[in-house]
């Protein structure tokens, strides 16, 4: 049974809504409202090009917000308007918004670890600036840490916002050091620790479904649920990321950086915050694996150890699964499974809850929320209508529905939070540290934990 509700009564057709004054100004190419400056350190890198710049453009197009972008990086000659245009080429950004953003974009060569360079960048960022600019570090964690140290020698303008990508640090100790350094520079309300997974559809939707539906909220607990599983598997291999990934692995790259934080929001409620969920969580089991040569989606993928830039002796895992125990009244006693891997055949990217079986032994009901496709599915048992004499279940049915389509992607939501001061997607200092506290015992266990092998294109851990 499949039902898609694309015409829900609370679906907003943006085309039929009157444009805001700012949107009309953007369309006319003469938005005179004060621009908010976002200076992106690492602005010529992959993250900026593939995710952040398209996200900013997406939100600017929706809201009419006037944004000025300064790309800052080590390269000495970057045509940033052309770079920006290339980044947005496939994004579907309206021409008017694209023209406005490109016209206001500039490039600044900077060594992120130089106080003198960062001071010059701040001077440029505060030109014609009413509110404090946003200084966004789209850099590897330890370069960000060095940049924050360099900011001690920079006169930061009032209201400046410091935004930094996860992971925060490379360990619990270094995460604490980064948080201590941030606290020396600005107040907590001026710090934005970015985890775009909190802006993915699945994470956003599960919170609303639980809190707003009597069908779900009363049974969203260990009394009625047997297992919660959060999975983000990928078909891709390294994709030229060996320099980063081979020193990191699946457990840190995905589970520590993202899925642990998603878990805290999935399990939180009005009485227990995500931070409290994290404090009450610990890892109790772990598995890991590494892909060998195989075929994924018709594409040959070499063995991980044969990928350029990989050092086989590191024994880096490309797939990790951990089981958590969460010691709260609502969740005590059931497994919380977090899993992520690369080179996976038929990958799942979802949040799922497996409910307890009924007394008649029928298969358990399962609720599934896709991370990316705005879809909800519920697996239930029913009678087969072709067998009217059946007195018990004899058919398995999946009820599925498209949710209200998202107006913004994950980085569009990040941009909205940055530009409006919304706090939902901001990680606290404690949350960033708790992620490391939870994962470090897992990493320590790897010395004695077998490194399983799975053929690329298959599903490990079966």
Spans of features found by a protein language model:
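Secretory/organelle targeting and membrane-embedding segments
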Residues: 2-163, 168-462
